[in-house]
UniProtKB/Swiss-Prot annotation:
Belongs to the universal ribosomal protein uL11 family. Part of the ribosomal stalk of the 50S ribosomal subunit. Interacts with L10 and the large rRNA to form the base of the stalk. L10 forms an elongated spine to which L12 dimers bind in a sequential fashion forming a multimeric L10(L12)X complex. Transmembrane segments: none annotated. This is Large ribosomal subunit protein uL11. The lineage of its organism: Bacteria, Pseudomonadati, Pseudomonadota, Gammaproteobacteria, Vibrionales.
Length: 142
């Protein structure tokens, strides 16, 4: 008989920096998951990714308290801020521009996000990411 999924937990954890403190500890602890086991497995899986980059993770907790997890690509907004070299987006994106991104940078981000975004070609993903950039107060060149 297959294990029954008891809960799905969605978190954003910094790559290579998972530890038992909030938000990881309380979220996993309330479902009876071994927190240190998750932290070690997550850090091992994300060691090739730039340390500190927020990584969305979906943890499936089973009825015997075991778990599996799937990591996603970093959010587009984080990748855009990194590409533009800004700390945060604009509070007033239509009037106050905080940086610029090029078409080549959008292409690179779209290719990175391709694994998570389904049903769209690279051009459609680029347009979607360009919209995100504009809503953050970034100028899209190209």
């Amino acid at each position: 008989m297959a294990k029954k999924v008891e809960a799905y937990i969605k978190l954003q954890v910094a790559a290579g920096m998972a530890n038992p403190s909030p938000p990881v500890g309380p979220a996993l602890g309330q479902h009876g998951v071994n927190i240190m086991e998750f932290c070690k497995a997550f850090n091992a899986k994300t060691e090739s990714i730039e340390k500190g980059l927020p990584i969305p993770v979906v943890i499936s907790v089973y009825n015997d308290r075991s778990f599996t997890f799937v990591t996603k690509t970093p959010p587009a907004a984080v990748l855009l801020k990194k590409a533009a070299g800004v700390k945060s987006g604009s509070g007033r994106p239509n009037t106050e521009k905080v940086g610029t991104v090029t078409d080549a940078q959008l292409q690179e981000i779209a290719e990175t996000k391709a694994a998570d975004m389904t049903g769209a070609d690279i051009e459609a993903m680029k347009r979607s990411i360009a919209g995100t950039a504009r809503s953050m107060g970034l100028v899209v060149e190209g």
